[in-house]
């Protein structure tokens, strides 16, 4: 029922969920994930189809080191861009970030649609493949997810992660404690952008074509739904939400047309019915003690 | 040349008037609750489609029930007013589902950004399922407005009557709203709630009723805007309101969050700026509003006529 292709898509969904989760863990609603995802994907599509140095073969193959180089460049580009945008917006109240990130998504979408080298509405196709089939993508996508998950887990013990939690719980109090709240919010925003950009690189190769529709307002809504369903109190929440909500419309074909209604309902009702999402720290603790009980 | 410039400016002002309506819808709710209602754009779409159906328009081939329509065919003005009533009710429903439960629980204001976005997404996609993604032109004869000619001659320029009418209705709505806020008892009560929610309640003002009033009014503005755009430009698919809603956000930041004159001035400026984009760069026009938004954040974060309010402890 779940083939390798769908599994890769689910893992990509989990990565995008984590990208929305990171600013939210610092109490910031950012809808910019699709913008950075689109930038990463466009960069990968452009470089691998136009830049001979990367060694994109006539048979449509791509050497693995080139993929890594793309990941590095995309991370750099999206990180710098996020630092610039975030520096502009994050000193203001939270509402400005939500508005400005929606604006960013629109600007990037229009740019990809209108720039002379991004292929217009059709986009860029025939993107070289570093792997022979879908199962080849499992390894790098899973690798990136494990890396991101490990980072999120580590964050909880690091000063930055603790500062993020403090800003989320009470920004004014955190500031009074001497935390540079703007810097903390900015760090979370940049991490989120780098993750989205890297995910875009992998997605562009996996999907084989790339155009402006990959990063739209609808994707903002979908990725936000991942986090609201799964929960933003632990990084496992958005991973679960991203995988489930990516798989669901594929598995339940009739839902196909109504998938945005489903996502909309999740973010309309989620904060009211389950403010912490489905995967909460309390749930994980209970599961943990169950596991220990069974092991004994 | 003069003629075309005048036409361009009037087109820009007409679009700007609609932006001002959208931004005012946001402003009403922002000034009372301090949050943005992200469902405003979807209500705008609903206004357009409701007007279309009330005028006797039928559902197209990609809709859920092709060929079906309402058993009425109202004249445009009446249809617009009924549609505004429909969007006012829908806006109250949005308040009930997306805002009221969170307010009662004393949740973070950020949460209602999320829930209202959800309400908007559900609404616009239900419209898409019902009406299909196709575009609709208003029924024939809609342009024959109360015996007015299609075109007016103004200073030698031929101008579409609907553009003038659109600007007049926007201006009328704005003036009425401002007068009501300034002069009437309930308008003053609304401003008192906007100033301080708790104190207003202590003074015997029913704050919750005022919140509902703000939502109903902003729903009316969305309905008027959607219907007018539908008549002057046609409905280009259920997402057309979202696009106006997003640009309304840029207008809001340009004018200054929470400022009524700022929303009006920002809307007109934005409409004019878009109209002046040369035709060979028209693909970029959609991004202009958001580029202006970033410029404002960089140069004057409080907006043209607003001020940044420090958070209260």
What role is predicted for each listed range?
Chain A
Residues 1-296:
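Transmembrane alpha-helices and adjacent helix-loop boundaries
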């Amino acid at each position: 029922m779940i083939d390798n292709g769908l599994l890769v898509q689910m893992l990509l969904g989990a990565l995008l969920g984590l990208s929305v989760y990171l600013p939210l863990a610092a109490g910031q609603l950012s809808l910019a994930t699709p913008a950075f995802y689109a930038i990463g994907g466009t960069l990968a599509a452009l470089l691998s189809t136009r830049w001979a140095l990367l060694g994109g073969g006539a048979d449509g193959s791509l050497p693995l080191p080139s993929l890594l180089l793309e990941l590095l460049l995309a991370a750099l580009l999206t990180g710098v861009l996020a630092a610039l945008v975030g520096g502009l917006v994050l000193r203001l109240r939270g509402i400005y970030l939500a508005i400005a990130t929606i604006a960013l998504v629109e600007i990037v979408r229009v740019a990809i649609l209108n720039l002379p080298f991004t292929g217009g509405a059709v986009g860029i196709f025939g993107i070289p493949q570093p792997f022979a089939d879908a199962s080849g993508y499992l390894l790098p996508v899973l690798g990136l997810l494990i890396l991101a998950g490990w980072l999120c887990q580590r964050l909880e013990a690091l000063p930055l992660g603790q500062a993020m939690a403090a800003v989320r719980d009470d920004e004014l109090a955190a500031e009074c404690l001497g935390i540079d709240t703007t810097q903390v919010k900015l760090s979370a925003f940049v991490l989120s952008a780098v993750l989205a950009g890297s995910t875009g690189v992998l997605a562009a190769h996996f999907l084989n074509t790339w155009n402006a529709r990959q990063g739209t307002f609808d994707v903002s809504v979908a990725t936000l739904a991942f986090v609201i369903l799964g929960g933003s109190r632990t990084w496992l929440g958005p991973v679960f939400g991203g995988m489930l909500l990516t798989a669901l419309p594929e598995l339940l074909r009739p839902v196909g047309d109504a998938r945005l209604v489903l996502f909309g309902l999740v973010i309309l009702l989620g904060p009211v019915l389950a403010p912490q999402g489905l995967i909460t720290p309390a749930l994980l603790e209970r599961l943990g003690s169950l596991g220990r009980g069974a092991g004994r | 040349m003069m003629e075309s410039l005048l036409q361009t400016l009037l087109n820009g002002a007409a679009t700007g008037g609609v932006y001002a309506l959208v931004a005012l819808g946001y402003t009403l709710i922002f000034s009372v609750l301090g949050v943005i209602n992200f469902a405003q754009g979807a209500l705008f779409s609903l206004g357009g489609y409701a007007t279309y159906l009330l005028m006797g328009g039928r559902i197209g081939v990609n809709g859920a029930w092709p060929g079906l329509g309402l058993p009425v065919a109202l004249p445009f003005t009446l249809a617009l007013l009924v549609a505004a009533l429909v969007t006012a009710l829908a806006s109250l429903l949005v308040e009930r589902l997306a805002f009221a439960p969170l307010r009662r629980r004393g949740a973070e204001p950020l949460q209602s950004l999320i829930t209202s976005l959800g309400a908007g997404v559900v609404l616009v996609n239900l419209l898409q399922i019902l009406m299909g993604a196709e575009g609709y032109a208003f029924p024939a004869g809609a342009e024959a407005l109360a015996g007015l000619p299609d075109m007016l001659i103004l200073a030698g320029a031929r101008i579409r009557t609907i553009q003038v009418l659109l600007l007049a209705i926007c201006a009328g709505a704005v003036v009425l709203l401002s007068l009501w806020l300034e002069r009437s008892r309930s308008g003053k009560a609304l401003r008192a709630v906007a100033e301080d929610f708790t104190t207003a309640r202590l003074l015997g003002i029913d704050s919750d009723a005022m919140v509902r009033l703000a939502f109903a009014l902003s729903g009316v503005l969305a309905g008027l805007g959607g219907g007018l755009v539908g008549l002057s430009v046609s409905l280009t698919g259920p997402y057309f309101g979202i696009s106006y809603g997003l640009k309304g956000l840029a207008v809001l930041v340009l004018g200054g969050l929470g400022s009524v004159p700022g929303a009006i001035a920002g809307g007109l400026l934005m409409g004019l700026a878009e109209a002046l984009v040369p035709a060979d760069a028209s693909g970029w026009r959609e991004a202009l509003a958001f580029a202006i938004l970033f410029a404002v954040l960089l140069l004057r974060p409080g907006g043209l006529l607003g001020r940044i309010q420090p958070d209260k402890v």
